[in-house]
Amino acid sequence: ACFLLAKFFADIFKASAHADTIGYVIGGGLLAAVAVVTKFSLGSILLFVLFVTHAMVGAVELGTDGWIQNITGNLFTSEQGKYLFIWTSAIMFGLRFCAHFIEHKLKISPIGLLFACAVIACVGLNLASTMTSFGMALVALGIYAVGKTFFWPTMLAVIGDRFPQTGAVAMSIMGGIGMLSAGLLGGPGLGYCKDRFAGEELKRADAALFEEYKAAAPSKLLNIESTAAVGLDGKKLGEAKDA
């Protein structure tokens, strides 16, 4: 959590030449403060694993949600992309009212539900990677939506079930970690991958065309210099599509 906060503050002060240093100093200070408050207790290893897992949930679930309309809009039409986003959101909205039925009538434990959701979401994502028609997209993204429906709330339920003594504190920390991960790793991470792989593919296929449409500044993941990759200029691509 402190690492994510450090990267968050580094992004706030990115205009400064010492943005990373400022971020790490703030993150280190927060870590030291937490260590003093908790009397340097290591805490539960399982709780730490759940926090790390929820960071991945936030990045994958909310990060994908932020990009899904653009991705499907490019595969099909912009209007169809909106319909697919509404379709997946409607499935999740409806199923979350069925959580009580699933747990008490079907007798599925929170851990069992997380496992089932992981399998279903994996199947849905693999199908989504091969979709070529709007009908196939409805099926693939519908399966993915069913899988990801209970990730976030069930992770919070596991915390409350396994660590009741933490009260709302652990749930709040877990939710914060998930949102920070989505904002720092999920959306930006997918954007970085898009820039990196689109640029590399165009450069391999047509170096001259890449030089014409490449972005002025490189993309970086978490502002790390070693991850710098030159993507494509969105404005130039938009003008080319409209031409």
Can you annotate each of these PLM segments?
Residues 188-243:
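Low-complexity, proline/glycine-enriched hydrophobic segments characteristic of transmembrane helices
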Residues 165-198:
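A late C-terminal transmembrane helix in Major Facilitator Superfamily
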Residues 55, 135-151:
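Hydrophobic core of transmembrane alpha-helices in multi-pass small-molecule transporters
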Residues 2-18, 39-94, 183-196:
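Extracytoplasmic gate region of multi-pass secondary transporters
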Residues 112-127, 135:
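Structural signature of the two symmetry-related core transmembrane helices
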Residues 62, 145-153, 179, 183:
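Small-residue-rich segments within alpha-helical transmembrane domains of MFS-like 12-TM solute carriers
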Residues 64-68, 149-163, 170:
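Intracellular juxtamembrane helix-capping segments at the cytosolic ends
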Residues 95-110:
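Helix-to-loop junctions at the C-terminal end of transmembrane segments
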